[in-house]
Amino acid sequence: MRQVIVAVLAGFILAGCVQKFPGPITVKPEPINISEQEVKAKIDNFYSECSKLKDAFKCKRAADDIYKSGDFRSAAIAYDMVCYGFQYIPACKQLADMFAHGDGMPRDIDTAVTIYQIACNNGDNNSCDLARNLRVQNQNR
């Protein structure tokens, strides 16, 4: 009986270890312009919703919805909140991607590298590669 329980628990643990993070957003929407008041209202609403959810995955999905609407400024703030509030690597990577590509903000390679490095230090090997590649590209300019 003990072996069955151990086997079942091992299965649950392994299933949790191989759980995939949501993939990156692959289609970049058209950016929209919104006022500072609209950004503040959207972020206040996001913060309230995310505080109720208390779930990094669901909060990142809500930030993805903001991004997909084309409101990159609000999305960057939302990803920042999820990245640093939950230490949720997919949100950190999306924020770094936004800095690397200049989505809704001036392109900032140094900030992108810093955020990718945070994700790398938390075990995301892809972020290590992205940080290294951006450093090399930046040095060659």
Regions found by a protein language model. Give the residues of each.
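Short helix-capping/linker turns of helical repeat alpha-solenoids
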Residues: 52-56, 66, 85-88, 101-103, ...
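Hydrophobic face of amphipathic alpha-helices that form TPR/SEL1-like repeat modules
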Residues: 59-68, 94-101, 133-137
